[in-house]
Amino acid sequence: MMNTPNKLTVFRVILIPFFMAFYLIGSTWSQVAALLVYLVAAATDRYDGYLARKYNQITTFGKLMDPLADKILIMSALICFMQRDVRYINAVVIVIILARELIVTGIRLIAMGENYVIAASIWGKAKTVSQFILTIAVMVFELGSKIIPQLEVVFDTATLILVIVAVALTVISGWDYIWKSRKLLTFK
């Protein structure tokens, strides 16, 4: 039977197509709906891990799916932003973030197969938080630009800063993860 933290993780994944559909419609009401769906999905990320630790319900499924659900949610948002030509969200940003996620996921799978534990780092947590802040801020800024068009330059500048921070933390956390797993990655 699936426990509550795992149900929350699955629920987060189920919300992704709804978020994407609402966002890509592009009307004001659908952007509000997309933001609300995204906020609910992001909130489940906070609570599934908390509940799993609090009630000792940590599972292999959760260890794999929770970070994967985060990656899918964030990448879905970034791809939607690129599709809608959101300034500063381009293929280079997406490739850097996706490459890091694929490399780290690959290392994580190898580590699990070898019963090798790579401790979570503050860099990985900061990376995830920065990506969630970026994706939520972009949606808020888009809505804000419709309400107060005069602030568009401010929103653009803030988006650029958030993109730089998210990409920098993505690269740093990826390097940190590779460095911590160097013994595992020694090819024999």
Positions of the model-derived regions?
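Alpha-helical transmembrane bundles and membrane-interface segments of multipass inner-membrane proteins
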Residues: 1-188
